[in-house]
Design a protein with these regions (language model features):
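Extracytoplasmic/periplasmic/luminal assembly and interaction segments
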Residues: 48, 59-99
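Acidic, glycine-rich flexible loop segments
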Residues: 143-177
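Mid-length scaffold segments of soluble, non-membrane domains
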Residues: 92-154
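Short, Lys/Arg-rich N-terminal segment immediately upstream of the first membrane anchor
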Residues: 1-6
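A mature extracytoplasmic/lumenal domain signature
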Residues: 88, 132-134, 143-145, 173-177, ...
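Hydrophobic membrane-insertion alpha-helices, especially the h-region
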Residues: 10-26
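C-terminal partner/receptor-binding element of secreted or periplasmic proteins
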Residues: 184-211
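Ser/Thr/Pro/Gly-rich low-complexity linker/stalk segments immediately outside membranes or between
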Residues: 28-43
């Protein structure tokens, strides 16, 4: 391979798509997913997915090798119940640990441990390590769908720092996306830390099947 493209995970999607992800965490009344209008939520989410398909199909920075035959990404049906309020257990300020994250090409990148997020899915207690890179937060995770309906190397969720309040934040698994290396091996992408393997099937967000 002549040149391995290495991009931090926060730049694996363009600004318009990132803005859409941020919007999902800024929905009103984050403390209760039942307050989200499911019809409006699904409509807005579908609009953003359509926008991402257009980007993947037409933009020169898209990882899709054969854009002419690309018909769109495949997703689980939008489900507001996978938009969960997580409690954060932050690492002490000024004492945050660094974490070496392996990339798919065998190299490393250094991230900062921001907090552990605890929440429930299907009445099961879950815990994920939230990482910080520059001024953004991200969750890199695997679950029971990894390697089956979703990319085996895991999926990502980006979180805006401003969405954190009182050591709580909404994690919307409907916004989970596959890294670029899922579609193009020229990209080197971070792998989830071993502790971020959820014991449940997260049937939300992007699947690993093209239409």
């Amino acid at each position: 391979m002549a040149n391995i493209l290495k991009k931090p995970i926060f730049w694996l999607i363009t600004l318009p798509v990132l803005a859409a992800v941020i919007w999902l965490f800024m929905l009103p009344d984050q403390a209760n997913t039942a307050t989200v209008d499911p019809v409006a939520y699904r409509a807005e989410l579908q609009a953003e997915r359509d926008k991402k398909d257009e980007y993947m199909r037409t933009n020169a920075e898209s990882p899709i090798p054969d854009k002419a035959t690309f018909k769109g990404l495949t997703y689980f049906e939008a489900d507001p119940s996978f938009r969960v309020m997580a409690k954060l257990e932050p690492f002490p300020e000024g004492k945050a640990e660094k974490l070496v994250i392996k990339l798919t090409d065998g190299t490393d990148e250094i991230y900062e441990k921001y907090a552990h997020a605890t929440f429930t899915v299907d009445n099961k207690a879950c815990r994920l390590l939230v990482l910080k890179f520059q001024n953004s937060l991200s969750v890199l995770f695997q679950d029971a769908t990894s390697g089956q309906q979703t990319y085996g190397g895991g999926r990502y969720i980006d979180i805006d720092l401003d969405a954190v309040a009182n050591n709580q934040v909404v994690i919307d698994f409907n916004a989970a996306y596959s890294p670029y290396c899922a579609y193009n091996p020229s990209y080197a992408c971070p792998l989830p830390p071993p502790e971020n393997k959820l014991p449940v099937a997260i049937k939300a967000g992007e699947q690993y099947v093209q239409k």
